[in-house]
């Protein structure tokens, strides 16, 4: 390379380095002043600029750099990931940007800075991961503890580790920690509220029967303790099965240790296991279902040789659908791909399994639960939360652009005058509270009011979308950005339920009571959640981080042409899409279905490298 080209390359590296530094340190919240938003003055920024310019320059001039060594497929794949990450960052920062800031102009600078920075980061991670996975680590003998835990006594050993990590929580929060949803489901069982299938009936019966009989038999504390004990046992078993599949895939021991520590010691998993809430039951079965899918895809002969593996797959699938309403979508989008890639001689067996899953699920939902007194909603309004939010934002920003006919339809469904002031991007409940008739109420037990107006509402929704599509797009981003933007923290009780004064106890449905003398221990455990502010570890508490992991994994597997392995990412992707239209933005428990599968996905990526 001649001097003129080197100078041009250096100038380009400096320009891109400046843009990347601006993007990394941008302050879009404090002021509308563009120069202040650049936030470029400071030694930290100078060090970052120097490092970035050096890295960019070396990538461009060094023939042995990642950029020059990568094939076109890798460049396109990593470039796509960098582009997606950049768009996520720009959308996320827009939500908190100062209203006077010319954000569109500033976003152009950030775009020019984020893309190369993310490309460099993603390329490094992808190349390192691939090169490391090619190493077989032959001849390296594990230590005695590692050998005992991950080779000789996987299930027993791993379950013991998980229980030991949960033990401080089980003791300190004895008998349990109560959530609003958990208390509401017990209230359904008690008959204090109309028992609908708004919450999964199976969980309501499970929680409610324990609360009822333990109170009736005079052992409220011991009875309620069965809930966290059951949830912890299920979690421990699920993690043990993850480690068992890691053993089959011969994952490196450092990876097994890291995954075990994540599942066993991460404070979010610990506190939710002792909390009465359906998500704590969903995670183990979602994880077990994912492990069975991995087993089926990569160890087919062994999987289909034992009928119990098919039975377990069916059981875990059914339990997923009965514990969270979105579990059915995981099945419907995952199993067709599994069916497509397995050999023809196995398809009949898998088809029968799918029919059994769906048949039992339909039987429970349409026959068993109604026979037990559960009222089936005609249409669940939570499904339409994002549409309601868009309607509310439209009413707030374009009140003059609503026709009399549209207002009449909307006013029949909502208290229209209250709709604009109740628009809250983080929480759709405020807009749902504007409904004239709440589903599950005495006057509207089946949600028939909304069902009758749904067709007319959709017409109004679509007509207003055509007039102001950007308003609808803005509303969607405002209500969902936390699930793909990793710089925003969790919303309201996102790190767990550390207090007991909830629905069930305040309504005197149970005499269960946490031990007052253990309040200091509960306080100390709550302080552990402050780890979310520690660099690196803090990312584990961000919903958007897990979305990025899944996006990276999905594209990485495309780059490596591991199309069968991509099926393992489908449950996480489905859960992520459901989160984006959910009633609450940045609610970490909604993201559990994605979070719990990320370590399994990473292990599969590593396993595919070992097979080459």
Annotated model-derived regions:
Residues 271-282, 323:
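Short acidic/glycine- and proline-prone juxtamembrane loop motifs at membrane-interface regions
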Residues 1-19, 41-83, 102-166, 608-612:
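Start-transfer (signal-anchor) and selected internal transmembrane alpha helices
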Residues 120, 229-250:
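Transmembrane-helix motifs of polytopic, lipid-linked glycan transferases
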Residues 309-324, 335-336, 356-360:
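Membrane-interface alpha helices of multi-pass inner-membrane proteins
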Residues 157, 242-265, 284, 304, ...:
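Transmembrane-helix signature of polytopic, membrane-embedded enzymes
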Residues 30-47, 222-226, 474, 478-569:
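Membrane-interface anchor segments at the N-terminal boundary of transmembrane helices
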Residues 173-185, 194-210, 218-222, 593:
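Extracytoplasmic catalytic/substrate-binding loops of multi-pass membrane glycan-assembly enzymes
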Residues 372-515:
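Membrane-proximal stem/loop segments at transmembrane-domain junctions that anchor or position
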């Amino acid at each position: 390379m001649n001097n003129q080209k080197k100078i041009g390359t250096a100038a380009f590296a400096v320009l891109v380095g400046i843009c990347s530094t601006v993007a990394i340190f941008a302050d879009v919240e404090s002021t509308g002043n563009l120069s202040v938003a650049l936030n470029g003055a400071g030694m930290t920024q100078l060090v970052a600029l120097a490092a970035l310019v050096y890295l960019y320059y070396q990538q461009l001039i060094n023939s042995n750099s990642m950029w020059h060594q990568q094939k076109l497929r890798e460049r396109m794949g990593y470039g796509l990931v960098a582009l997606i990450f950049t768009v996520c960052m720009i959308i996320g920062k827009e939500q908190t940007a100062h209203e006077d800031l010319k954000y569109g102009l500033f976003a152009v600078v950030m775009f020019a800075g984020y893309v190369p920075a993310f490309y460099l980061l993603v390329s490094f991670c992808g190349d390192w991961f691939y090169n490391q996975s090619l190493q077989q680590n032959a001849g390296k003998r594990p230590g005695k503890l590692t050998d005992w835990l991950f080779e000789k006594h996987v299930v027993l050993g791993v379950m013991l580790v998980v229980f030991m990590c949960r033990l401080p929580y089980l003791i300190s929060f004895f008998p349990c920690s109560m959530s609003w949803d958990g208390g509401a489901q017990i209230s359904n069982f008690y008959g204090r509220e109309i028992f609908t299938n708004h919450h999964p009936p199976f969980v309501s019966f499970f929680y409610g029967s324990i609360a009822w009989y333990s109170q009736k038999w005079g052992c409220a504390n011991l009875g309620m303790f069965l809930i966290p004990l059951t949830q912890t046992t299920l979690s421990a078993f699920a993690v043990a099965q993850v480690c068992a599949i890691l053993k089959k895939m011969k994952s490196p021991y450092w990876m097994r240790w890291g995954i075990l520590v994540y599942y066993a010691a991460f404070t979010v998993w610990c506190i939710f296991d002792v909390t009465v809430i359906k998500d704590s039951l969903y995670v183990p079965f979602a994880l077990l279902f994912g492990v069975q899918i991995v087993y089926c895809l990569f160890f087919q002969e062994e999987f289909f040789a034992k009928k119990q593996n098919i039975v377990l797959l069916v059981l875990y699938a059914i339990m997923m659908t009965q514990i969270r309403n979105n579990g059915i979508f995981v099945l419907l989008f995952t199993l067709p791909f599994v069916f497509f890639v397995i050999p023809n001689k196995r398809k009949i067996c898998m088809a029968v399994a799918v029919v059994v899953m769906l048949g039992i699920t339909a039987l429970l939902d349409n026959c068993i639960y109604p026979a037990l007194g559960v009222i089936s909603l005609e249409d669940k309004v939570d499904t339409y939360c994002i549409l309601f939010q868009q309607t509310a934002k439209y009413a707030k920003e374009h009140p003059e652009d609503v026709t009399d006919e549209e207002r009449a339809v909307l006013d029949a469904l909502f208290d229209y005058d209250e709709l604009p002031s109740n628009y809250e991007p983080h929480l759709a409940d405020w807009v749902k509270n504007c409904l004239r008739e709440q589903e599950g109420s005495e006057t509207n037990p089946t949600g028939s009011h909304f069902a009758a107006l749904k067709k007319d509402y959709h017409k109004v929704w679509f007509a207003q979308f055509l007039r102001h599509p950007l308003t609808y797009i803005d509303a969607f981003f405002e209500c969902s950005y936390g699930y793909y933007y990793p710089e925003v923290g969790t919303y309201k009780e996102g790190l767990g339920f550390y207090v007991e004064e909830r629905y069930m106890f305040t309504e005197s449905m149970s005499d269960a009571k946490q031990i007052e003398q253990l309040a200091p221990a509960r306080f100390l455990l709550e302080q552990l959640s402050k780890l979310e502010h520690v660099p690196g570890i803090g990312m584990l508490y961000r919903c958007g981080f897990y979305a990025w992991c899944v996006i990276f994994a999905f594209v990485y597997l495309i780059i490596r042409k591991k199309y069968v392995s991509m099926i393992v990412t489908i449950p996480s992707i489905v859960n992520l899409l459901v989160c984006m239209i959910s009633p609450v933005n940045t609610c970490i428990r909604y993201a559990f279905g994605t979070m719990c599968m990320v370590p399994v996905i990473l292990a599969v990526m590593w396993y595919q490298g070992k097979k080459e």
